Amino acid sequence: MIVLTQSGTLLFDQRFKLSKFLFVVIATGFPLLLQQASLIYGYNHEQIYRICRSFLYILPLLNCKRGRISTSGLQLPRHLHYECLEWGLLCGTHPAIQIVGPTIVIKLDDPTTAAAYRSELLRVSSSSYIQNAAGLSNGWGHDMEAFVRNAICLLELRERSIPQSGLRDLMGNHQHLVRSLLDACKVDHFVPLDFQHRSLMLNFARLYNQLDLQGRAKSFRALTGFPVYVPSEDYLEGSFLQKELQE
């Protein structure tokens, strides 16, 4: 189901819809895959490190409600494009993301750069701003000077909001990352699928709670379903209750 490349990236060799069963199979099969990479195929520490980074990035996305894996990559609904870009920056892993109609295809074997992800985030967020500002008389100013001033301000705000890698503490230690992933993959194989899935979710939630999600815990939880800790103030952000309390 998952195959490895010499560069240390992960590929899918079959086509499946995303499901609890697929998530459990891939998560519980990862320790054996890593063992084979090290003992049978002789992957070095750097290759093992890249494999673990790729797995850390892709596993939460396999828990999305809709999508599929195929030989071309991981296919998800297009509206998750922005969140996947943010997650890639947080995770320090930047596979190419191709837009195909109503879906995006995450090409795990085609790495890009953090700079490319930041550029795409700026493009997407700026396009969204322009669309929302359409029809507003003062959306971009009444003259060229105001337009330039507002555009520069927008770009500066967007650049400051783009996440940096949040995995420095966890990713900086190769052995700690490998051990953490292997521990999270442990599950009782003699219990029903739902119990295995729930156990894995909790295991990986503890792992991802170690990461600096930079205020994006709520969107990460919505994207993946992982029960990571979300500060109460983030839950209230933009809500009716928050507006009432602020008045």
Curated annotation (Swiss-Prot):
InterPro entries cross-referenced by the UniProt entry: Virus_P0 (IPR006755)
Keywords: Host-virus interaction, Inhibition of host innate immune response by virus, Suppressor of RNA silencing, Viral immunoevasion
Keyword Cytoplasm carried by entry: no
Residues annotated as domain F-box-like: 76-95
Signal peptide: none
Pfam families: Luteo_PO
Gene Ontology biological process terms, A to Z: symbiont-mediated suppression of host innate immune response; viral process
Family stated for the protein in its record: Belongs to the polerovirus P0 protein family.
Its biological purpose: Suppressor of RNA-mediated gene silencing, also known as post-transcriptional gene silencing (PTGS), a mechanism of plant viral defense that limits the accumulation of viral RNAs. The P0 protein suppresses local PTGS using its F-box-like domain to mediate destabilization and degradation of the AGO1 protein, although not via an interaction with host SKP1A. Participates, together with the proteins P1 and P7, in the inhibition of the induction of aphid-induced host phytohormones. This could play a role in the attraction to the infected plants by aphids.
Free-text domain note: The F-box-like domain is required for suppression of host RNA silencing.
Name assigned to this protein: Suppressor of silencing P0
Species the sequence originates in: Potato leafroll virus (strain Potato/Netherlands/Wageningen/1989) (PLrV)
Organism phylogeny: Viruses, Riboviria, Orthornavirae, Pisuviricota, Pisoniviricetes
